[in-house]
Amino acid sequence: MATLPSIHAFWKLWWPTFSEERKMTVVQALRNGLTRKLFQITQIAQQILRWPPYIRERMTSSLGQSLVKTFQTLLGIRKALSRLCLTRNMNVDIFTMLLIPFKFLSQLCSQIVASANFVIQTFRHGLSRGLCLARCRNPETMRSGWSKHTLQMQNCSSTSPLMTPFQPQIARDLSNPHGLWMSTRNKLTRTGGSAIQQTSRYVRLAVRFSLLAAGAYISCVLARKALKEYVYRWELKSDQELPTREQSQISQVEQAMEQNGAMMVMKLNGPTAPILSLQDCLTKHVLVPEIVDEEGTVTQKEQSTFLIREFGPAVRNLVTLAKLEFGGIPKKTTANELTVWRFLVRKCEHANMNPTDSRTAISMALPYVFMPCRTDVGRASIPLRDESIEICRQYRAQFVEETPLRRVFNNPLSGKAWRNWVRHLGGLDDPALFQELKXGCLEEWLGVQSRRTRARHPKLRSHFKDTRHKTRRVFRIAGLGNLYEFGVHNNSAVNLERGLMERVFYVKDDKGELVSCPEPISGIFWKNLKGFRNSIVHHVGHRHPVSRETFLAYYTGPKRTMYEKAVNSLYEMPVSYDDAKLKTFVKAEKINLTKKADPVPRVIQPRAPRYNVELGRYLRPVEHPIYHAIDKIWGGPTIMKGYSVEQIGRHIENAFRSFTDPVAIGFDASRFDQHVSVEALRWEHSVYSRIYGYPELLTQLLRWQIHNRGTAYASDGAFNYQVDGKRMSGDMNISLGNCILATAITHDFVTKLGIPARLINNGDDNVLICPAVEVGRVRQELYRHWLNYGFEVISEEPVYILEQVEFCQMRPVFDGTQYTMMRDPRTTMSKDAYAVTPFNTPTAARRWMRAVGECGLSLTGGLPVKQEYYTALVKHGLDPKNIKQGKDFDSGLYYLSKLSNRKWQEVQESARYSFWLAFGYTPDEQRALEEYFKSWTPTFEWSTTGILAEIPECLLLKHNPLPPT
């Protein structure tokens, strides 16, 4: 016990006087000393293999004393180093490096005890089984007997507790090892036959190994007993032995961290201090008192702040909250430090803490977030596995074929096997003493089954089968982002029924009840939007439909093949009403399960390709002319169909800068397709009919969209339904029609208000840009105006910064030369790591990675964070071949990427500033994320279906920063 005061005095008195070079010399010497202490355990354990039985007792005593001395020395040094770190005289990186040996002590003890118990039971069972089999001459019987014995030992090892004491009979046998061996040999000799040669080697090994494990077990018990006594005495006498400490903030922090176990001292006796919440550690300080008049009205609000009354518990709470938030001990990187700092700042701001005290407390708490406490070490000693079943059977997993223990049993004459086991027993598997196991990055998740709806509709007939539904799967590349969890809906009867009920027939009101969609005011489309329709027809002019062969030229790949078959069949039989019937299924899309745990499945309702060919001959030729006509009506580019991300960014910039004091108000029509009424469809159809002069075929094709009949099939059920109106998600005019309706209704809105405005539209996504003085009128009247047309819109918060204008989940970011639209990295870093494309093999996964990386890089070259994200996918991927032509790859990312051709380039500082304005990541956080993606090295191995791969990820990937206002 005399080492503690001297060690403390050394750090207290002499350490500040040392030069930096001498400090590093002392640190290196300490490190070497800790390593030598751990190697002493291994060296003594190696002697067990050579010493005769009569000196086992002496060996056990030596090993026990060595363990006790090692624990005592380590605890003393740990205490001194903790004080040193608190006084800020040592770099935290050096301190963390010196703490590595402490992380492994608990695992070392557990392995010694587990090995001892297992080997002792193996010896007893193996001896009895060997005596029985020795009397049997039949080789088949011996082989089956040993197989049963192996199974019995596996079951025994999986249920044995770690700290089971010796049984009396086993203890008596081990107390006289020479007599045990002689009696066993005599028994085997009496059985006779060749069985002696087959079992002698096994029994000899079992006896030798049992003695080894027994010595290790006894030493561990002695060490634990001495450690408990030592810690107990240290707790009672430390205040008397150590110099008097000043009652300062540092001492408060040290006491609080000891109570929480951060000093890794196991407090086995005595009461612990009550754990205070963060608010209990603060005291309120009123800056401006509240003033109330005689009538009780508050004329002046109180202004106050909170000061830290007890720094120790406050810092302890901050450390605990950070570890709970980030799942234990984060890896000490610059990115993680920035993330933890931001988290702690938000906690202090939420508590209305004084800024000066907040900075002091955060500076003290930050190093401890990256240091293991008692509970952290216990968690870290459990090896991370790819599969949850391995975690549940971690004790049994020590005895599979690959473990050092099993290698010794299988190769008893191998010196390498014995050396590896001794190193494993001493906790020296790795020079770093502790590291997380590498796990595969490929995950497979089963499809999502939503809850069954209770709603019923008279026009929907259900037919459920007593069979299982087909399960879809979604795949993920772990390590790229885990802020959001995504899934995919199964094409099951339950999902189909709910999708039809809540996305076709009913909508939810303010109370969450299912009601019918609101109907527009009768005649409002023909009364208010007649001029808008006439303007479109005037700018487009009279047109003629194209031939079927010309229509095929609009498509390539699988879609062209499908429409070619439809064209051939139309020459044999004309289009009919049966071709207009709907074939409904659940869309296989990536759904965000973090934002909404049980979203309503989205259904796709396509008509026959024959119908699409005939209608497409009329609509495809006039689609872009109608877009240009709408642009002329609005006075600038309005419909963002067919533009690249650079062109969209330029159009939004021009629209935003066309006003002196602009404001952008985004609004999204809630379930736009579902709210399209019969009157809205008829008004939209009148636009096409007037352009083509009301041809009979076009009129008939459009009339079939008014009264719809459909069927939906799944392996466990089928549905028949009828519905009037609505926009069917597979129709040829879904995009064109939505753009016409949205721009027309919004144009009527700004005309009635009499305000100058520009609209950015892409169907149901809208951004209205107008002078800031009009924001109140716009937000007040917008919902009411759209409701008159039968639509419900959700208005977003107005933004006054160009980079924060959100359109189609993208924001404009300046790349150094121009503005380009960038998908939100807070969502896409998680979403782009998921795939509905099957990963049948790791090679298929790497081909998919390369395809996504190439598409993403063509959109984000020269932009912060996402450029390195997609570069990492390209770097670790393989040639994608024809993956991009598959139907599973049909997405907005792919279509946008075909319009851009950006390449990798250095990120400009102006781009980092613009990126911060858009998404809230500071330039330092951007660089930290980029460094993470540059150093990301995936292991293409599988985890079990539905089990996380447990890949350690950068904490910034789970960080959702708020952009500046």
Curated annotation (Swiss-Prot):
Record bears the keyword Transferase: yes
S-S pairs: none
Q: Reaction catalysed?
A: RNA(n) + a ribonucleoside 5'-triphosphate = RNA(n+1) + diphosphate
Domain named RdRp catalytic is located at 662-778
Sorted alphabetically, the Gene Ontology BP terms of this entry are: viral RNA genome replication
Record GO terms (molecular function): nucleotide binding; RNA binding; RNA-directed RNA polymerase activity
What name is this protein filed under?
RNA-directed RNA polymerase
Q: What organism does this protein naturally occur in? A: Maize chlorotic mottle virus (isolate United States/Kansas/1987)
The uppermost taxa in this organism's lineage are:
Viruses, Riboviria, Orthornavirae, Kitrinoviricota, Tolucaviricetes
